[in-house]
Amino acid sequence: MCIRDSILGATKLHDFDGITPTVANIRPTSRGEINIVSNNIKDYPKIKMNYLSTDDDRYVAAQGLKLVRKIMLETETFKKYEPEEYRPGLHIKDDEEVVKAGSDHTQTIFHPVGTCKMGKDENSVVDDKLKVHGIENLRVVDASIMPSITSGNTNAPTIMIAEKAADMILGK
């Protein structure tokens, strides 16, 4: 399948067929930041993703990428297709080099959580009733209050948070 240039400015990556296996760390230990930079609602917040910033996450990434190589290049299922590694390239072998090459293409899997800490300390955003500290009549009712991501899709736990919030708001 080829994406037309007119769609989001996409261009064809190369002139050969291929597949893109991916590695997804579903229990990352790296933590990013979202900071409000002004009181103007039109100013975007400052977002620092901080992907692969811990030793654990770099280890998982390196081992995952090595496993993908092994599956793609050494299993009978794929060997018959004579696969060649396009990126990062077989010349990159050291764990840190593999992670560096992978980090150039690291991105979210669109399930951000944990951006609005619950608690009573100065770094928390909401209390145990999901009310935002210092602001009346505002609650956070989504995955951002989760302390860490679930191993599966975040949809069901987020629905549970919303159901609990509805009960709290209704005084049940």
Stretches with model-predicted labels:
Residues 4-157, 165-172:
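FAD-dependent oxidoreductase catalytic-site/capping-region signature
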